[in-house]
Structures are given as structure tokens and as C-alpha cells.
Amino acid sequence: MTRDTQLRAAAQQSEWDLIVVGGGATGLGIAVQAAVQGYQVLLLEAGDWAGGTSSRSTKLLHGGVRYLAQGHLGLVRDALQERQTVIRNASSLAKPLQFVLPAYSVWDQWRYRLGLWAYEGLAGNASLGESAWLDASEVATHSPELRQGLRGLVTYWDGQFDDAGLAVALMHTATRLGAVAINHAQVLSVLTQPSGLAHQNLAHDRDQSTERENLRACGVRWRDQLSGDVHQAYAPCVINATGGWVDGLRAASNARSVTWSRGAHIVVRREFWPHAHGMIIPRTRDGRVLFVLPWLDHVLMGTTDTPCDGMDAHPRASAQELDFILEEAGRYLQRAPTRDDVLSVWAGVRSLVQANASLQTSTRSIGREHSIWQDANGLVNVAGGKWTTYRLMAEQVMKFCCRHKLVNPNIPEVSTRHLALDCALPDAWADRPGASIELLPGVSEAFVRWCVQVTSAQTVEDVLARRSRWLLLDARRASQAAADVARVMQEEGV
């Protein structure tokens, strides 16, 4: 379904059951959950699907061994259950991945083994595989790239997925179920009205009405970022799922709701870790873990946890973060990567929820739990969380809206636990014109046309960063293909 089709559908309808603002993991999940229950849903995303933090993750579906060590047992248990759900419902985009955890002492050996035993115990029937111990004599065969001196390795299982691909799958699933979803559609303000009155000619922009009491959110004012046209849409329930931008859509509040943390990643050639399994570096100098992962015939290393002052549409990793990742990986790999080996550097900004986000708290100590709350004007906000638990978050948001009677509470709940997602793949375009004209490995002219016509890609970045992942894999090669991608998109009317 093309973006133009979605725009026409939105133009034919001004009133909805709910409006979701934000097309990342959280907003897309909510749109699917609401649509499967039969609500009329409008989803608006200022940029591309998963154009912010949701496409800049470490590509893992996991409970989080670090969160287990920090005592976030509920988060870990929920995430391990949801990990299996995502892999089952989006099997072409997600898979189990084995990890190795190096141990250099007897203490490390038993600590890691006991910790992973607890990790598997929390997974219960959702376990992806048993952990195992490989002694030093087996390491040379299993993972010879590791530095010598190891006592052995603990192996365990987690999940890996295509974050941007899953976002597109959720968009397709939501629209198949009846939602209208538009990317590159920026919400300018929340509309409000006096409680109990119809919206006609009474709605105000939030900025014009914050001094008035008893006003309720009744819709949004939004702009098509491509045409410049401004529209209004109305709904008794407006959900703010904008991640780190959550406070920008809210009326004035007493305290900031989120703290921000930047996570940087680097990509190097496969030769540094030529395995189908990943490695977790259990203890960096700042107390985090670091991952070394096989990813699209390359190696992904990350991530960092750097406090930052706010959201950025295009966050950049610092030189210190780049050096940190290289140094920490070099402590464990016999051949340490250098700056010259780095093909791409990129970062995402996490939104972390704590009781008072204005307090100076180490972001490493803040869990990845999510929070759902309602402002005085009725705007529903959701922040925090992680990709692995997106479905659970969406389910809880809709229960919250029903409990507060923002949507019809008589509509029965419907579980999405076994809902197969529409994982659109370009295979059917293999015989289309341009299929043999390759711009990058895996990126043909036909693929670019598929991105525009099927996935609502509207910019070169949409194609190179999120439909393919070349901008994250090898920025230089992606840049060299940008002009050809733009030419094909222009032929498609974009």
C-alpha cells in the first residue's frame, strides 16, 4: 500500500478512535494492537518508519544479562518471553543467535555459568537453547580469534533481528488490519477542547490553551513533510509514542519524564569475527557489556551508554565512543581493530524513564522498563522500554486506554501473541524491470522501486539506511550509490 493511498484514506476521514504519534517500535506496536481489536487508528510519523532510535539498535532480541545482574528480574522475564514471540511471528526477520562469554578465571567461570542458569530459568519454556561450557582446549577450534589465557567460554542463546525491517512489517500489518499509517507526517500540536464538547470549531492548539482549565486532548494538527499541506485529525484518544521526543508534545509539566543516553556502534569487516555466533564482552571499564556480532556479512560492535542532553534526529558518536569500542574489543580479540578498519559509525539515543528525570543519575543504572501515564489534558504518553518488549508495551497501552475509557472499553481484548506479521520481502520483484541492474549488493533498481511502492520509502536515506542497511554497514559505499538511488526514486515520482 503506497503512501499516496494512505494519504487519500486520511483525507476521507477526519474522526478516529485513536491517533498514535510516532512510528518507531512503540507506536507501530500500538497501531497493530489497536487495529487488531477493531479500532479506527491513524498513525503519524514525522520521519521514516523507525527513523530514529528504533533503527539504530544493537539488533538484539534479548532479556539482557546485564539487567539480570542489576536485579531487573521482571524486565528480563518479560523480555525473554517476548523474544520467542517475535522470532515466531517474524521468522524471516528474527532468529536465535548463539553467544560466547569469555571467562579468564575460575570465579568468572562459575559466576557466568550460574548467571546464565538463572537467565535460562527465567525464560522457562521460551528458552532458545541451553548454555554450555567449553574449556580452554575447545576455544581454539570454536573461537580462535580470542586472546589467549582463557579458562574457557560459556555459550548461551539469545535473538537477533532486523529492527528497521520489523518496523516495516508492523506498518504493513497495521494497515492490513485497517489502520491508516503515514510517514513523513509531523504532528505540530495536540488539539484540545473543553471536556464534554464536540470538537467542531472548538479545538485549540495546545500552545493557545495551556492556561485554560478542563481542556482535553481531542486530536492533532499535522503537516505532510513532503507537500507542506497542514491537516487536522480528531480522536478522543491521542497517544504520544515519540520516544525521546515525548516531552515535546506534552503540555507544561513539573518534571522532565525521560533521561537520554546515546548508544554508539561501529561496523568492521567480517574477518575480525568470522563466525555465525556472537560474543559478549562481560565487563568494560565503565561497567557495561559490549557485543561483537555477525551482521549482514560484517561485524557489528557496540554499544556505549553516554548521557546526553536531549534527542537528536541525527546523533553522532563521539571520537571517545569510537575509541572506547575499539579498545574494549581489542582487549579480547587477538587482532585488535583500529580506526582504519571502521567502515561505519552510527548511534541512537535511548529514552530512559526514572521517577525524576531531572536528577543526575548514571544512565547505566537506569533499567529499560517502560512507563505509561496520562497528562491532565488526557494525552496518553508511553516512554522507555526496548524493541524486544514492543508487543507487550502495546498491549498494556491499550489496556490503559480502555481502563481510562479513552476508547470504547466494550470492545474485547485480542491477543497478538500469535499474530504473524506481514514481513514484506522484495522477492516477488525479482523479475521486474531493473532487477538485474545492481546499485549495491542486494540493492537493484527493482529493489528501490519496491521500497517506494510497497514500503513508503520517500528519501534516499529511507532506502539506504532502513530498507537496505548499507548506510550503516559501509557509509562510503552507500554514498557512492546515493545518486543512482535518487534517480530511480525520481522515476517513481518521489
Where are these regions (language model features)?
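Extreme N-terminal leader/targeting segments of oxidoreductases
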Residues: M1-L18, Q33-Q37
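Core beta-strand elements of the Rossmann-like FAD/NAD(P) dinucleotide-binding domain
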Residues: S14-W16, S227-C237
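Short hydrophobic core segments
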Residues: V21, Q232-G243
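Glycine-rich FAD pyrophosphate-binding loop
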Residues: A35-R56
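Dinucleotide-binding Rossmann-like beta1-alpha1 core, especially the glycine-rich loop
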Residues: T58-H142
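C-terminal catalytic lobe of FAD-dependent flavoproteins
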Residues: G165, T173, G248, A255-L300, ...
